[in-house]
Amino acid sequence: MLYGFSQVILQGALVTLELALSSVVLAVLIGLAGAGAKLSSNRPLALVFEGYTTLIRGVPDLVLMLLIFYGLQIALNSVTDALGMAQFDIDPMIAGIITLGFIYGAYFTETFRGAYLAVPKGHIEAATAFGFSGGQTFRRILLPAMMRYALPGIGNNWQVILKATALVSLLGLEDVVKATQLAGKSTWQPFYFAIVCGLIYLVFTTVSNGVLLLLERRYTVGVKRADL
């Protein structure tokens, strides 16, 4: 049913999944750092991340992606020229991970900031009273408590990142979008392969929903739900 393009499309789907997972890891790390910075008493650092989140959320993803990709390429070429080295192109996968991670790190920043503020202060005070260090308090008390509040936002951000990987095909990445486009052009069946591409993304998001539901159950153990 895939006119001999099954292997190409499967490889593209794996590339898409690798890109999404790598990007979300980078975005989570940036988000945790950004949330800590915005909540810190260091005013200049908080202002830097405030500007970062405002900029990212106010400019379309595609525009940011092109700006970051070409900006990195220009900066890299400037360095190689200054060192007398030959120019080389940034790998599309690396470029995609950096751009998506940087863009969605802003959204994770707000997700984790809100989750931190939702944790009762008594949790931290109790950890301090028991002699926990700052790192122990974060790992054993704060992070597990935050996850319950952050999971809905994390799930939403993951779904958006997963779908945003389709934009990285514009940077030359041979992902599932590029693979299905190639198959559509080669077989004169663009609409059919667009449906195939959409179904692959639907499978990814459906499986993701199941995993997120399991995580939500894990982190809400002992929490009573109110029936409205």
PLM feature segments, named:
Residues 1-228:
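Transmembrane alpha-helices and adjacent helix-loop boundaries
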